[in-house]
Amino acid sequence: MRKAAVKRKTAETDIALELCLDGTGTADIDTGVGFLDHMLTLTAKHGRLDLSVRCAGDTRVDDHHSTEDIGIALGSAFREALGDKRGIRRYGSMILPMDEALVLCAVDLSGRSLLRYSLELRARKVGTFDTELAEEFFLAFTRAAGVTLHLRQLDGRNTHHILEAAFKGFGRALREAVAADPDAAGEIPSTKGTLE
């Protein structure tokens, strides 16, 4: 089983996170940010990731620090759980519909951190969640995980639906990328011989 546990404590947040890449989609999430809990639960379910997150953050200020630091913790756990990436597919993609919303998500577990984020979110908030924080979450994840991630909105008007499609697509793309490649068992999927 490919798994990792990360603890991250700063003056702003205290996070305990456990991740299993070979899971069933079980999520036990309490971040103090309700909408983020919902999105991470969707990512775990659609990625078949077992994910546990506990976060005590300075949400009396706003949700920024918790959202960003959870992205860092999840990215760190993801990188650790993957190990040397031997035998994985490396690439994953999904075009995911959520009612009128349609979002493309593509990942490369290259070891190089890059985020291309093209979501046009009309609402500044969903519930109490500042929608601009979704980009901060994905940016923090890509930096910590060493992952290239493209998120592109192809259609949609409802901000909740667009974000839901993005997080579900993210889970599905990760699931595909971390899956074993039966044609390359034991091989590192790079002509360089490493993915760092």
Report each predicted region and the residues it spans.
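Structural preference for solvent-exposed beta-strand-turn elements
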Residues: 1-196
